[in-house]
UniProtKB/Swiss-Prot annotation:
Any Gene Ontology CC annotation: extracellular region
Tissue: Expressed by the venom gland.
A GO MF label: peptidase inhibitor activity
Subcellular location: Secreted
Native species: Tityus serrulatus
Function as written in the Swiss-Prot or TrEMBL entry: Venom tetrapeptide that inhibits activities of the human peptidase neprilysin (NEP/MME) (Ki=0.94 uM), the two mammalian endopeptidases EP24.16 and EP24.15 (Ki=36 uM and 74 uM, respectively), and a probable cockroach neprilysin-like protein. It shows 3-fold better inhibitory activity than proctolin. It may play a role in human envenomation as well as in the paralysis and death of scorpion preys. It does not inhibit ACE activity.
Parts of the chain that traverse the membrane: none
Protein name as it appears in the record: [des-Arg1]-proctolin
Note, other: Is a stable peptide that is not originated from proctolin hydrolysis.
Amino acid sequence: YLPT
């Protein structure tokens, strides 16, 4: 996942 992409950290936001």
